[in-house]
Amino acid sequence: FTPKPGTGAYSRVGAAGPTTAQTASVQGKPCAVCGATDPKMVADHKDPLVVEHYRTGSNDINKQTSTSAVQPHCRKCSSSQGGQASVFSRAMKRILGL
């Protein structure tokens, strides 16, 4: 993965979701990773915000707030992905010299 040259450090944009509609859309569905179900599922962006940011240089808020942009995650898989995203973000900062 090569980040878009000139991209600044990622800072999560709250407006990118998950929105109430996105969260509602994943309830009662199995986790896209492990198949588990939790009483409250997490709306996971199919294209993680941090990845989109370093690939394109920004986040497409309209795309990322649509219900089709998310998939269900259980809490365990969501937490695991959060750690992976943090490692990814640090690597992108090193590559970009940030």
What is the predicted role of each segment?
Residues 1-98:
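Catalytic toxin/effector domains delivered as secreted proteins or via bacterial secretion systems
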